[in-house]
């Protein structure tokens, strides 16, 4: 089953009220707590970590996102988007028109980050500050189309942080509900069409369920376990960890398509966070590459140096 967002009235016409045992197909982010929780987790993980400086840098960017979210709320009428999107995700990155709000968000992020920046980070922020709107749009399009270049990787986390804020705000404004329908392409976010950063096996009311966390709009969509999140095959799956079988972070590899995605288990550690713990477990990525697998997800603070399919 794939996931589609439909207008509330259509859902009410076609479905009975939620039954016991119903699995929520889609979870929208709670932006009031998302960034503060992520920043806190990044700072926790940075302590005595080989990548501590970079995790601390990432925490600073996330804290800036929290401040900019508060100072620059998005006011946008998306009432017709669901009706116009058809089979596509309503905020499809391939076709949804970006407006100037994301430029405002980027400028605000730069303003928040510059006072504490130095060296290469400060130079990158200043270069972004000088960039024309056309240059920014071209770089944004390249990132969203997965056209990565090593020479632009220093700018990518900041541009993506602004784009992510923009899409996450829009996702929160969608006037509809999600339902599971027959279909394919479940490896892509049903809200915006981007790809996951990691998968989270949850606690609470969704205990034991796996949700893929979008690396752009921050939504999470249900994906059954013991099935490759990239090609949906289940015959050649293996699970890898650095510590033990009880590790809170594992890589799920697929011998059929040759890719892997990290899974974070809240039952093993309730503090795990989709972006933070994925970034802090880079050693596991190195191990998976040594085993011949390629990553099927992208962390917003760790972009490839070349384009991917």
Curated annotation (Swiss-Prot):
Q: Which GO terms describe its cellular component?
A: cytosol
Q: Which CDD domains match?
A: FdhE
Q: Which domain of life is it from?
A: Bacteria
* UniProtKB keywords: Cytoplasm
Keyword ATP-binding recorded: no
One MF term in GO for this entry?
ferric iron binding
Q: Which InterPro entries match?
A: FdhE-like_sf, FdhE_C, FdhE_central, FdhE_N, Formate_DH_accessory
Q: Which family does it belong to?
A: Belongs to the FdhE family.
Q: What does this protein do?
A: Necessary for formate dehydrogenase activity.
Protein name per its UniProtKB record? Protein FdhE homolog
Q: What is the lineage of its organism?
A: Bacteria, Pseudomonadati, Pseudomonadota, Gammaproteobacteria, Enterobacterales
